[in-house]
Design a protein with these regions (language model features):
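N-terminal capping/small domains of soluble enzymes
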Residues: 2-132
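N-terminal small/glycine-rich loop or linker at the start of catalytic domains
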Residues: 49-71, 147-160, 185-187, 258
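Conserved small/polar residues in nucleotide/adenosyl-binding loops
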Residues: 333-340
Length: 341
């Protein structure tokens, strides 16, 4: 059967509509990820077209992922960081959003203090696990958008979640439905996408999310998370490590629009910035970063680096104020730790 693609406006075979492959044993892709060797980069000699969106922006995870590698910030430190992010991002909101934990009393107090500032950018969002109990915290805070952790590799599905693919899909969809019912935009964080079965789980899962989104009349956002830093920017690299292939696949096989597509990377193999720029070039509007690259293990995408990548690709800073970066560095390097405050 043929149908018109909304992306290409061409007739395409719907044989490219992938269904869930509910395997009995996890696919750990040991040919690429062997415990005894450095992860391998495979090539399939397939090129995908550049697809730079009309508008691109930066999102921030300094107050979420960044805090996971340092002593937790005080409420005052969080408020100061948020103010500096707003100044750095400028009046047009190139730093569009930031995300907060909501689990502790201090987390919620810091979030509320930042909301009280009334700043337009960066928009305040939250981060939760795919849990109905977690979502109740978000609903009670009146937040417009929340990240929801939805681990998508078999490493996480079978070994962390202790579920099958079909079981975890239903589990995730339950929390997403709660978000839609409450009028909250779900931003689904596809954890460990660079070790996932892209066509056997990722695409079918995102297609289910898209169906729920259409039914609710509320957009769903997709964050592709290179949790271990395995992504590569190389032309003609094969999935699951190809950044271009992941972005293209989510757009072409799951109809995710650029404005709902975000890349989150880590720097374990020193490719965080290159991978983030690749995500922009191939169709993701957003790249998720952390100030000074502070994050788990070797860190996240350095936000300040993407400020200059943005200017290089667009020919303008578009209102961003890079002089604020020095103030940010001074704050993060010289502020007393919470235990000394």
């Amino acid at each position: 059967m043929l149908e018109i693609s909304s992306k290409t406006n061409l007739l395409e075979k719907n044989s490219y509509k992938y269904s869930l492959q509910d395997v009995a044993e996890p696919n750990l892709q040991r040919d690429v990820y062997s415990y005894g060797t450095v992860p391998k980069v495979a090539f399939n000699h397939r090129r995908v077209p550049l697809n730079m969106p009309e508008e691109i922006w930066i999102t921030d995870t300094s107050l979420r992922d960044g805090q996971q590698s340092v002593e937790p910030y005080t409420v005052e430190q969080i408020v100061n960081i948020y103010k500096l992010l707003s100044r750095l991002g400028g009046p047009y909101g190139i730093i569009r959003q930031t995300e907060f934990f909501v689990y502790s009393k201090k987390d919620r107090q810091a979030l509320e203090k930042c909301m009280e500032l009334g700043l337009k950018f960066p928009e305040i969002t939250s981060w939760i696990r795919a849990s109905k109990e977690d979502f109740k915290l978000v609903r009670d805070l009146g937040i417009r958008e929340t990240g929801i952790l939805v681990s998508c590799s078999d490493y996480h599905i079978f070994k962390k979640m202790k579920m099958t693919r079909s079981q975890v899909l239903d589990y995730y969809l339950g929390t997403v439905k709660d978000a839609f019912d409450a009028g909250v935009i779900p931003r689904c964080h596809l954890e460990d996408i660079t070790r996932a079965d892209f066509y056997g789980f990722v695409v079918p899962f995102v297609n289910e999310l898209q169906a729920l989104s259409r039914q609710a009349g509320i957009p769903v956002k997709i964050r592709a998370c290179d949790t271990m830093g395995y992504g590569v920017p190389y032309t003609e690299a094969a999935l699951p490590r190809s950044v271009a292939g992941i972005i293209y696949g989510l757009q072409h096989y799951s109809d995710v629009p650029s404005e709902c597509l975000e890349w989150h990377g880590h720097n374990d193999f020193c490719k965080a910035v290159a991978n983030a720029s690749t995500a922009w070039l191939y169709g993701a509007c957003a790249v998720n970063c952390s100030l000074l690259g502070i994050g788990e293990r070797t860190g996240n995408i350095p936000l300040e680096a993407m400020v200059f990548e943005y200017a290089s690709l667009r020919g303008s800073l578009d209102g961003m104020d890079p002089t604020v970066i020095t103030e940010i560095a001074c704050l993060l390097y010289t502020s007393p730790s919470p235990r000394d405050a």
